[in-house]
């Protein structure tokens, strides 16, 4: 079915940025792996990424969505835009929808860029000129109570402090060791705006997720995200970006067996808190 419809699927993905598949005969991680494999895209493996969200692998290509506790909201973001390496497409599979909440909000970042340009062209110019830098706290061992709880050992694929410092130096990152061998890491400057294949631009970053949901470094109150020149992004601008993004956000309840394909270069996603007796289980596969 995918082979017969791939051209149409990709055409619609180019136009809309996301496609929802419903009622396909996909029941589990293995079926989902076969569905994703049918597209014949290059796999973007989670083990080799620099993401610091806790995930659990189900197959070589399939893993759980962020394992953060159900009461935590994961704010709008582009997958792994806080790192130099990020996937092109994201496949989500809802194996089991939650009883209440748990939606995956979607926001077109090319639309957001256009709205921000109209609202404050000088702010967009600062993002384009300076880019952004991110500061995150990596724990010594997985921290399951956080949306960014993957340990520095797993995030960077190392086992010792000497190895992690060498890896961070190669990446052009800076770092400070904290109490308990936790690690404060600051990225090199990364782009905040992405030029798309059609010539349009998207607000491609993790500014909202970092500013609204990440922990500050309690040692020096370093903000999780700043302009690349070190300047703080003022709260009024963050609130304006958040408000515009919310006005462009689509929210739909998951149904069991739904599959969602999104273009990670153009569409941000998140996760709403959830509750109820039915356990939410959403699986993910990334492609390059």
Regions found by a protein language model. Name each.
Residues 1-8:
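N- or domain-start disorder-to-order transition segments that initiate the globular core
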Residues 44-78:
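A gly/proline- and charged-residue-enriched helix-loop-helix capping module
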Residues 26-41:
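Glycine-rich loop at the start of a catalytic domain that most often binds anionic cofactors/ligands
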Residues 1, 14-15, 70-75, 85-288:
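Active-site environment of non-heme Fe oxygenases that use a 2-His-1-carboxylate facial triad
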Residues 9, 18-22, 258-262:
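Generic beta-sheet signal
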Residues 12-18, 25-28:
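Short, solvent-exposed loop/edge-beta patches enriched in aromatic
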Residues 40-52, 278-288:
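C-terminal end-helix/capping segment
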């Amino acid at each position: 079915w995918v082979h017969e419809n791939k051209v149409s699927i990709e055409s619609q993905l180019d136009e809309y940025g996301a496609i929802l598949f419903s009622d396909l005969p996909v029941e589990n991680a293995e079926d989902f792996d076969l569905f994703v494999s049918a597209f014949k895209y290059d796999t973007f493996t989670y083990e080799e990424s620099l993401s610091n969200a806790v995930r659990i692998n189900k197959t070589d290509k399939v893993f759980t969505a962020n394992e953060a506790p159900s009461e935590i909201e994961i704010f709008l973001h582009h997958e792994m835009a806080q790192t130099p390496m990020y996937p092109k497409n994201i496949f989500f599979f809802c194996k089991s929808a939650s009883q209440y909440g748990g939606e995956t909000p979607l926001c077109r970042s090319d639309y957001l860029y256009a709205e921000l340009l109209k609202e404050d062209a000088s702010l967009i110019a600062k993002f384009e000129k300076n880019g952004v830098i991110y500061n995150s706290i990596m724990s010594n061992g997985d921290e399951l109570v956080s949306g960014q709880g993957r340990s520095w050992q797993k995030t960077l694929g190392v086992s010792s402090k000497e190895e992690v410092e060498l890896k961070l130096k190669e990446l052009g990152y800076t770092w400070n060791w904290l109490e308990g061998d936790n690690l404060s890491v600051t990225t090199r400057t990364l782009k905040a705006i992405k030029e798309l294949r059609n010539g349009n631009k998207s607000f491609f970053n993790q500014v909202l997720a970092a500013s609204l949901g990440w922990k500050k470094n309690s040692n020096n109150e370093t903000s999780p995200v700043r302009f690349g020149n070190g300047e703080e992004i003022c709260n009024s601008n963050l609130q304006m970006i958040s408000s515009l993004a919310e006005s462009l956000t689509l929210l739909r309840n998951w149904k069991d067996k739904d599959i969602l394909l999104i273009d990670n270069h153009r569409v941000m996603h998140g996760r709403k808190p959830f509750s109820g007796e039915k356990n939410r289980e959403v699986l993910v596969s990334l492609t390059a």
